């Protein structure tokens, strides 16, 4: 039996993790800790789990922790858990910056613990099919990838008071919070880029950027465009991949498009087709099915049960953050940044 404690409900994804852990065989959600006692007590009551206000006692009560705090708290919480030898599941992004990410890396290595970075798109069959289309060569040589990822919460009145828009606690705005999903897909599928040119602004007047665009250039000539926003009232196509032999378009995989996009969600075209029209796929993105953020928790628990390395690593988290950190450097300097 694996005992897991959730450390903080600051990020709403903790609710999905709790649901997943409670449904998993041979897993016990042993404790909830939160530096906000009212928030932690409410979550514990809702899920029927003990609230443990003392962090060390919460860590002692478990075999593994799931960290879902404000991003700035990731490093200190992981350091405490790693020192106690506890495995860690960490909400994205891994840290507010690369210095904090290095702290986490040192703690994980020194503690010799299992670490899993949360990137839910890694478990979506739609993501795997896009990656297969690239890796198989069906689309030919890839010249351009466009990823638009964002939501509409920035348009709601209370969003300006939430920790997500406090740079001291979140580390950044849409480019970090939303863009890191795109960065991970690019790293996973194409590897690290050669350079980036980026721009960001706060069209809504938030303390962090609510709109951002980053152009990543790869050594083979491919360009990847990432557009991130907190202010998409609605959207459709989320990922576009253009190759020398074909195109793939995917919709419904971000909050801006999830509820408004209609199937087919994945469409492809290859130049060898007799009829020049889209070929629809029957795949429905996991995000549309409502069992999306749960997959990280399920995979984490499964890896611990089997005694295997988690499927998304510390290095995966750091690589995606590195892409975003270099993009921020480009925003600040106004020039292209080499990796």
Predicted stretch roles:
Residues 1, 64-67, 299-339:
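C-terminal helix-rich "cap/oligomerization" subdomain common to oxidoreductases
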Residues 1-46:
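N-terminal Rossmann-like dinucleotide-binding module
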Residues 36, 47-107, 292:
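Beta-loop-alpha module in the N-terminal Rossmann-like domain of NAD(P)-dependent dehydrogenases
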Residues 53, 89-91, 115-117, 226, ...:
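Hydrophobic residues in well-ordered beta-strands that form the structural core
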Residues 103-121, 141-144:
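Rossmann-fold dehydrogenase core element
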Residues 121-205, 334:
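Predominantly a Rossmann-like dinucleotide-binding segment in NAD(P)-dependent oxidoreductases
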Residues 180, 227-235:
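Glycine-rich phosphate/pyrophosphate-binding beta-alpha loops
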Residues 240-315:
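C-terminal glycine/acidic-rich active-site capping loop/insertion
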């Amino acid at each position: 039996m694996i005992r897991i404690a959730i450390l903080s409900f600051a990020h709403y994804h903790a609710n999905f993790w709790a649901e997943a852990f409670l449904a998993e065989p041979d897993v016990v959600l042993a404790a909830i800790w939160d530096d906000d006692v009212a928030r932690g007590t409410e979550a514990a009551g809702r899920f029927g789990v003990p609230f443990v206000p003392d962090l060390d006692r919460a860590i002692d009560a478990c075999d593994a922790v799931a960290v879902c705090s404000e991003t700035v708290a990731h490093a200190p919480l992981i350091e405490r858990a790693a020192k106690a030898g506890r495995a860690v599941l960490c909400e994205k992004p891994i840290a507010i910056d690369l210095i904090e990410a290095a702290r986490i890396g040192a703690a994980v290595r020194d503690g010799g613990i299992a670490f899993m970075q949360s990137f839910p798109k890694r478990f979506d069959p739609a993501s795997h099919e896009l990656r297969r289309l690239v890796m198989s060569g069906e689309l030919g040589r890839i010249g351009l990838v466009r990823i638009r990822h964002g939501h509409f919460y920035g348009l709601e009145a209370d969003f300006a008071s939430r920790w997500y828009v406090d740079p001291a606690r979140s580390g950044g705005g849409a480019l970090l919070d939303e863009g890191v999903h795109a960065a991970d897909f690019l790293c996973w599928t194409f590897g690290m880029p050669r350079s980036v040119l980026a721009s960001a602004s706060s069209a809504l007047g938030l303390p962090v950027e609510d709109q951002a665009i980053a152009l990543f250039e790869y050594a083979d000539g491919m360009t990847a465009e990432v557009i991130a926003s907190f202010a998409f009232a609605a959207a459709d196509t989320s990922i576009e991949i253009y190759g020398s032999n074909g195109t793939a378009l995917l919709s419904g995989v971000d909050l801006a498009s999830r509820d408004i996009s209609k199937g087919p969600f994945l469409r492809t075209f290859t130049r060898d087709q007799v009829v020049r029209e889209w070929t629809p796929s029957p795949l429905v993105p996991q995000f549309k099915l409502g069992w999306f953020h749960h997959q990280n928790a399920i995979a984490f628990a499964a890896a611990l049960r089997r005694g295997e390395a988690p499927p998304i690593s510390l290095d995966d988290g750091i690589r995606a953050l590195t892409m975003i950190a270099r993009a921020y450097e480009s925003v600040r300097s106004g020039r292209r940044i080499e990796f």
